[in-house]
Amino acid sequence: MTDWADPDALDLSDGETFDSLLDRADTREKGHFFEFFAEGDELAHDPGLRLTHHGSEQWMGQTLNHDPAYWRADTARERDFEERPVHPDYLLACVMGITVEDLSEKGGYFLGRDDVTFHQPVTAGTPLSVTSTVVDTKTSSSRPQYGIVTWETEGRDRETGETLVSYRRTNMIPRREPAATDGGAVGEQDEDGPMLPDTPISPDGEYFEDFQAALERADTENAAVAYRHERGRTMDDQLVAGLPLATLNTARQHHNRDEMADSPSGDIVAYGDVTRSVALAHARSDEATYRERRFADEQFHDFVTLGDTVYGFTRVLDCDPDAGPERAGAVTFEHVAFNQDQTPVYSGRRTALIQRDT
């Protein structure tokens, strides 16, 4: 009987031998299929990253988020931070990255995220602890090989237990066995096209009063406060593969071109939080941001692949002068990221505190 533990029993440098053995070998799988998840299940993810200024600065630099409060201690103090914090986009990506191996490493489509709330500023050196709870599972009527799962996730300080960020996220997840389906219904189309405001208005400046004045003007002119941002960012290897891996996001669709060659996208795709962060950077470059408050109704509409360029568009929805400290007011925006073909790839509502012009 052959001792297959003997190093000389197989010549794995021989192409035919290795190919035959590889075809017969089982694959030790990572991640979970749709059937694994049940409503009410709570998953405690492996200990996550200890947040760093280097990681935050790398994320900010690559995504064009240049707010000096996250780069400079003196500006952070002027903005009423006790210490220079890490950027909230970096925090959110690190919390979500930790969850990927347990929730969505099998692949599937990131459908959206809601109720994103930043509970307090977070500083470098904070160690993360992350849990997710399954809040809903259902069959996809359009793609029977997938199910749809929604989780509520909380990122905490592992040492103090304080909640740092929380959100609700929905993904398509591959099934072990496709579900029976009728294919779903097709919605009716409006042949007359969409109703649009007479005129889009842009704020005259970057402060809270500028957004408030623009909304007041729009109300009298049957107009909307809506504008595009000048900058664009082309997706390169660092954005598509490097940043997800730096936040422990192991989803194959961001770094395995072989696996993705026969997928609908035909290539590796950008991590949704990278696309989102680039779009938000474009928006933040045209405002005097004081603090991020919350995000809602975040959706990802199409693939973003290597070589695509992401641009930003913003609509101002509301201004609240009584929210926040005396030096800022709350503005609610709708942000849209779109590509070089003017195809929307991300949208979401965001409420931020914007500095007053004082």
Swiss-Prot record:
<dbReference type="InterPro" id="IPR048274">
    <property type="entry name" value="MC_hydratase"/>
</dbReference>
<protein>
    <recommendedName>
        <fullName>Mesaconyl-CoA hydratase</fullName>
        <ecNumber>4.2.1.148</ecNumber>
    </recommendedName>
</protein>
<keyword id="KW-0456">Lyase</keyword>
<dbReference type="InterPro" id="IPR052342">
    <property type="entry name" value="MCH/BMMD"/>
</dbReference>
<dbReference type="InterPro" id="IPR029069">
    <property type="entry name" value="HotDog_dom_sf"/>
</dbReference>
<dbReference type="InterPro" id="IPR045672">
    <property type="entry name" value="MC_hydratase_acr"/>
</dbReference>
<dbReference type="GO" id="GO:0016829">
    <property type="term" value="F:lyase activity"/>
</dbReference>
<comment type="function">
    <text>Involved in the methylaspartate cycle. Catalyzes the reversible hydration of mesaconyl-CoA (2-methylfumaryl-CoA) to yield beta-methylmalyl-CoA ((2R,3S)-beta-methylmalyl-CoA).</text>
</comment>
<comment type="similarity">
    <text>Belongs to the enoyl-CoA hydratase/isomerase family.</text>
</comment>
<dbReference type="Pfam" id="PF19315">
    <property type="entry name" value="MC_hydratase"/>
</dbReference>
<feature type="domain" description="MaoC-like">
    <location>
        <begin position="44"/>
        <end position="148"/>
    </location>
</feature>
